[in-house]
Amino acid sequence: NVLDIYMDCPSRERAGWLFDSYYTAKAEYGLTDKSVVEKAFLENYIKGGNLKNHIGMVSMCYPADVFSGSFVPQWSLWYIYEIYEYVTERHGEIEKEMFRTQVCGIFDYFKDFENEYELLERLDGWNFVEWSKLNDRVFDVSWPTNMLYAAALDRAAELFGISDYAEKSKRLKQTICDMAYNGVIFADRAVRNKNGELVTTDEVSQTAQYYALKFKTVPEGDERFERLKDIILKDRESEFERFGEVEPADVLPGMYIKMELLLKWGAYDRLKQEIKRYFLCMARQTSTLWERKNGKCSLDHGFASYICVLIKRICGE
């Protein structure tokens, strides 16, 4: 899946996609202790990744972008997350200041989509939260998208010392907790009613909870965080069903976020259980790992190499 840049699937998608790169970069560094390909990937984005028709926004994949000119607004936020980890965790060779203008441009772009609560509402482009019903729950306000937005602001604030970003992130997280949290779990979205009021729906999913935990919508140690963490650690997510039908997580990105969390928490037995549950059948069928658990997309996907890093960590390497 790698020649000169990260590719999703060499037989189908010879393009460097954002978001996928977030996990493929972790795999490169985890397997080689280097970020050679990631450096080339990020340099491409610095030099030519900005869209001409949507000032401030970056391409969803570059080079070899799609002819339609469409873009995934959420991927620009994952890009900021990748930049943060490249600089702070992988100690990449590209100086962080090389990213400043582009990162600030992304946030300037999003200002036009902020509503009266500073929440992102009805974003342009191909809104992508997960390969599941969550992708049908992006309007009017996607709570997972706003969790990601708040976290990206926080990362940029830390990276570049921009206090306004940190303050906005804090306000957004509080708003999300006030509007999306029902006392146990977070909802998937809010919609405008006939009076124009923003009302949170009763639609819920596993992945929205993973977003809330990864992006620290509630801080670690907070009772709400610990309650969700305990449910996931003890494999008791069926408890969410008392709030109605719960959309299960798919591989991209729900399962990866969940596995990241289990790794961070040192829950290696649970992590091993999840890897076997979702990926062993893929390996047995095709000797590769897939983009989606139903096998309808790529059956040899680059970001799936992150599983190797998880297995190494389980084995103590």
Regions found by a protein language model. Give the residues of each.
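Phosphate-binding glycine-rich loops and their immediate beta-loop-alpha structural context
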Residues: 13
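Mature extracytoplasmic enzyme cores
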Residues: 1-5
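Active-site core of glycosidic bond-cleaving carbohydrate-active enzymes
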Residues: 16-317
